[in-house]
A protein has these predicted regions:
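Beta-propeller blade termini and top-face loops
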Residues: 1-269
Length: 269
């Protein structure tokens, strides 16, 4: 909303409260000192610097935190963002539906874009990096960035876009993808996928054991940003061991007494 009062222009937006004394030419941010107005969809932390991170905010672009300062480096709705594990000056970020991909090689000082492939992406299109810095994305299928072009690796996993995609940090040939209530696994770098485990409810996130890849952690619920009446009834947190032959072991329910009225998201760091 925009309102004039005492010759000042007040702006109330998803990003906060701003005031202009020159008719809208410049604005002063009145929410900069401690008023929390942003909601992160995703964050990623640099592997070698826990103080450096990137993240996508609903309606408030993509941010990078570097040298204890937050700065905007993309526009639109910030979605899935990643820091390159081999060089933390290289950062990536998706806006809505995964189009385009924002790329910066100097910690957000300058930014380029790469258009999405022909495949359809979710509102939050998953972005994943291998330990070697290879970039993957989940649209209707799994794609890998080759220079400035997306290369399609897999067939469609199902009838809808991929909900989450992760690369095993211990083995870049192992990828996990979630679509609906099913987790798929690839052992050949994302070319072929087989069914790994089926859950009773839709999957919101996957995280992989960072030590040895011996297990994945799965959360079931709709994603952050969905209204309460759109959330699924069956929500939980689960551990699924990964056997040496790539099969899923017995699922362990870790939900315990977590509240059932929230969306869940798993991070292993």
């Amino acid at each position: 909303t925009l309102k004039f009062f005492n010759n000042k222009l007040y702006c109330g937006s998803d990003g906060g409260i701003y005031v202009s004394e020159d008719g809208g030419v410049t604005f002063q941010d009145y929410t900069i000192n401690g008023i929390a107005v942003g909601q992160f969809y995703r964050i990623s932390v640099a592997k070698d610097d826990s103080g450096k991170m990137v993240g996508g905010l609903q309606d408030n672009s993509g941010f990078i935190r570097n040298n204890e300062v937050w700065n905007v480096y993309t526009g639109g709705d910030g979605m899935d963002y990643e820091v390159d594990p081999t060089n933390n000056n290289i950062v990536y970020g998706f806006v809505q539906f995964g189009d385009p991909l924002f790329v910066s090689t100097n910690s957000g000082q300058t930014v380029g874009t790469i258009n999405s492939p022909a495949g359809n992406g979710n509102w939050i299109t998953p972005l994943a990096l291998s330990s070697e810095g290879d970039v993957y994305a989940g649209y209707d299928a799994v794609y890998k960035l080759n220079g400035n072009t997306w290369e399609r690796l897999s067939d469609d996993l199902g009838n809808t876009p991929i909900d989450d995609l992760e690369v095993d940090p211990n083995n870049p040939l192992v990828l996990y993808a979630a679509e609906g209530n099913t987790v798929f696994r690839s052992d050949d770098g994302g070319i072929t996928f087989t069914e790994f485990n089926v859950f009773d409810s839709g999957i919101s996130d996957i995280a992989i054991n960072t030590t040895d890849g011996s297990a994945i952690y799965v959360t079931t619920s709709n994603r952050v940003g969905f209204a309460q009446n759109q959330q699924q009834d069956l929500r939980g947190v689960f551990k699924v061991p990964a056997e040496t032959n790539g099969a899923a072991g017995a699922v362990v329910d870790l939900t315990l007494n977590l509240p059932q009225d929230h969306a869940y998201f798993a991070i292993v760091h």
